[in-house]
């Protein structure tokens, strides 16, 4: 234990002097080790006493994207204890994997196939680590370093991670200096505390520091996973830097939380045992890719931050993290809501036979060991990457999901619709409708315009006027009457009825459509027209002459009406009347107005004194007639005098 009494900064300097990871800094991006920087500088001018120092993790990238300088002296005693031979470091094609086995497994190298298989099984090209394997250090720009504390605890890091240091629960001060933090473009270092635990911070995810009783971690789009015996990173993208500080140095701006992050305090979760071969970490809470933070009590905080990882923090008091900001008040408890984070609602467990972890996990809860008074206010949700979980049991989510109903109307809705239609039909039947008459086929009354059908001068129900052959309703369709039976067009044309069909009296063609019968003859409706004006006479009064030519009433009177002998105009019936009034005298026809005395204009009729006395074909009254004769009037007319009788 004497070597742990030494200044941690000096121990770190001794370790880094002999590490082959220095090869990374030969590309000119980092300066050479400076022997003058072997001692730890004070941060912000504050002093620290030996045994009570906390070294802050310096992020590789600043907020503006520049790379920070990296000191090269860090934790040599731990390196000498874990890596006695510098030749056991990994090459560029290998990835450092955390170690839980004895010294015989520590010198094992992992092949490129194993590394690639694990990288893509975790959802990231670099972040895959398997617990229970030998820790190796990779060179160039994909370096990872894992160091152990004296009690044999290890922490896995991501190839794109940086350094974070955590110490015992009594550490209260932090210092930043070129020698107190180490960063590389894609490297990670783990600094052991005073026999407690280790922490690793990603250079592209967050800046985190663990202090006295509270460990705080933040990442723009990550959440933190850590455990006493190891941790595993998940994959997620990051887009910024979030700073975490001790609560005594906190500012009001650092306690804000991300609207898209959720929190779960897992301090009541016991630090269960682990299986080195299956790499089952039963107490590791896992946060979702959208930044869930879980915290769990432990003797010291082990922190793993991956640039594309989900992170869970186990601290002695509490852990806070959010996307882009965090809360540093340990007394502020933020329990995770049950239905929160829809993307984390379904988590399943499937692990490949070789120990590599897939992207699914399952929810686990653990019994409460301490602080039972806060049991009701928080929900403990643990995440297990492995198939064998010895310390947990599966449980249902704290809310029930209502099963989705099948698409389409339900049985009750269909039944309601059927009842509604039936009721509408009944109402329509019983509703009082207009009465049209009696159906000539069934003898029942016809109610409603929709039920009335008129054809061939008769009234039918719509359902009664059907084809005799196929039973189709013929309302509004062409039909054929054959010997008192009606047929539809299809049955009439293709059933041999053409031989018995009637022919039009006008054109002589077979009547295939509607038939019009008049004067004992059959006509096409289009052929039954006036021979003078050619207007259709279907449903219009008409008349015929002796030759059976068809005339409308107007044209018939124009052609066949008698002409007045006085005005020589046809004598037509009065407007609105069908009767013709005329006066017949001397076998001539006269209008009533034209029948008057030609000399004096006296209206002539059958009355006494108005009678007509024609003379030489002229209409004369009795006085005018004598005047023309120039003869004296006899008291009695001679017997040979003709008497004219007017006919009306």
UniProtKB/Swiss-Prot annotation:
Organism in which the protein naturally occurs: Danio rerio (Zebrafish)
Compositionally biased region (Polar residues): 197-213, 220-241
Amino acid composition bias (Low complexity), ranges on this chain: 158-171, 178-192, 252-267
Protein name per its UniProtKB record: Wilms tumor protein 1-interacting protein homolog
Gene of this entry: wtip
Keywords: Cell junction, LIM domain, Metal-binding, Nucleus, Repeat, Repressor, Transcription, Transcription regulation, Zinc
Pfam families: LIM (PF00412)
Family matches, as Gene3D superfamilies: Cysteine Rich Protein
CC per GO annotation: adherens junction; ciliary basal body; nucleus; P-body; transcription regulator complex
Protein family (similarity comment): Belongs to the zyxin/ajuba family.
Localization: Cell junction, Adherens junction; Nucleus
PANTHER family: LIM DOMAIN-CONTAINING PROTEIN JUB, WILMS TUMOR PROTEIN 1-INTERACTING PROTEIN
Coiled-coil region list: none
One of the GO BP terms on file: cloaca development
Stretch list, region Disordered: 27-56, 142-291, 306-327
Molecular function, one GO term: metal ion binding
Protein origin, superkingdom: Eukaryota
Function per UniProt: May monitor slit diaphragm protein assembly, a specialized adherens junction characteristic of podocytes. In case of podocyte injury, it shuttles into the nucleus and acts as a transcription regulator. Plays a role in the regulation of cell morphology and cytoskeletal organization. Acts as a transcriptional corepressor for snai1 and snai2/slug and plays a role in regulating neural crest development.
Domain annotation LIM zinc-binding: ranges: 437-498, 502-561, 562-631
């Amino acid at each position: 234990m004497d070597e742990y009494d030494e200044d941690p900064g000096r121990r770190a300097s001794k370790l880094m002097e002999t590490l082959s990871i220095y090869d990374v800094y030969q590309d000119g991006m980092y300066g050479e080790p400076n022997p003058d920087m072997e001692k730890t500088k004070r941060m912000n001018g504050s002093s620290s006493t030996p045994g009570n120092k906390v070294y802050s993790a310096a992020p590789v990238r600043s907020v503006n994207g520049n790379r920070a300088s990296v000191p090269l002296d860090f934790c040599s005693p731990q390196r000498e204890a874990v890596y006695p031979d510098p030749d056991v470091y990994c090459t560029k094609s290998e990835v450092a994997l955390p170690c839980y086995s004895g010294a015989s497994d520590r010198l094992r190298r992992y092949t490129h196939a194993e590394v690639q298989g694990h990288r893509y099984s975790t959802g990231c090209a670099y972040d895959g680590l398997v617990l229970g394997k030998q820790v190796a250090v990779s060179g160039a720009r994909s370096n990872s370093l894992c160091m152990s504390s004296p009690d044999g605890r290890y922490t896995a890091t991501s190839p794109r991670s940086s350094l974070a240091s955590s110490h015992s629960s009594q550490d209260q001060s932090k210092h930043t200096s070129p020698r107190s933090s180490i960063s590389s473009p894609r490297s990670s270092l783990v600094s052991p505390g005073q026999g407690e635990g280790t922490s690793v911070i990603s250079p592209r995810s967050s800046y985190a520091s663990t202090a006295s009783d509270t460990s705080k971690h933040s990442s723009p789009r990550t959440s933190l996973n850590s455990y006493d015996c190891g941790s595993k990173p998940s994959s997620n993208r990051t887009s910024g830097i979030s700073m975490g500080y001790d609560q005594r140095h906190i500012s009001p701006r650092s306690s804000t939380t991300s609207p898209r992050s959720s929190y779960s305090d897992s301090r009541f979760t016991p630090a269960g045992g682990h299986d080195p071969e299956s790499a089952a970490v039963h107490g590791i809470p896992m946060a979702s890719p959208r930044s869930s933070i879980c915290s769990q009590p432990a003797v010291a905080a082990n922190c793993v931050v991956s640039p594309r990882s989900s992170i869970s923090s186990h601290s002695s008091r509490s852990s806070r993290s959010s996307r882009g900001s965090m809360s540093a008040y340990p007394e502020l408890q933020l329990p995770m809501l049950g239905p929160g984070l829809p993307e984390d609602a379904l988590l399943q467990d499937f692990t490949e036979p070789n120990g590599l972890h897939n992207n699914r996990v399952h929810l686990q809860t653990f019994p409460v060991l301490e602080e039972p008074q806060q049991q009701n206010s928080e929900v403990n949700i643990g995440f297990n990457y492995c198939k064998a979980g010895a310390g947990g049991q599966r449980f249902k989510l704290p809310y029930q999901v209502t099963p989705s109903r099948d698409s389409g109307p339900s049985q009750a809705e269909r039944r309601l619709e059927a009842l509604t239609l039936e009721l509408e039909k009944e109402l329509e039947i019983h509703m009082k409708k207009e009465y049209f008459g009696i159906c000539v086929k069934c003898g029942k009354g016809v109610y409603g315009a929709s039920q009335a059908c008129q054809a061939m001068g008769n009234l039918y129900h719509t359902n009664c006027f059907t084809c005799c052959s196929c039973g189709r309703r013929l309302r509004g369709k062409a039909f054929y009457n054959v010997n008192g039976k009606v047929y539809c067009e299809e049955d009439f044309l293709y059933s041999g009825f053409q031989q018995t069909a009637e022919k039009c009296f006008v054109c002589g063609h077979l009547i295939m459509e509607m038939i019009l019968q008049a004067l004992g003859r059959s006509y096409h409706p289009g052929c039954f027209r006036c021979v003078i004006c050619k207007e259709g006479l279907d449903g219009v009064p008409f008349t015929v002459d002796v030759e059976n030519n068809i005339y409308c009433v107007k044209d018939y009177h124009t052609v066949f009406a008698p002409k007045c002998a006085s005005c020589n105009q046809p004598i037509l019936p009065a407007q609105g009347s069908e009767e013709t009034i005329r006066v017949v005298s001397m076998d001539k026809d006269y209008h009533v107005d034209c029948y008057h005395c030609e000399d004096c204009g006296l209206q002539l009729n059958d009355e006494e004194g108005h009678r007509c006395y024609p003379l030489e074909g002229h209409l004369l009254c009795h006085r005018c007639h004598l005047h023309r004769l120039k003869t004296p009037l006899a008291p009695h007319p001679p017997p040979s005098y003709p008497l004219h009788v007017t006919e009306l």
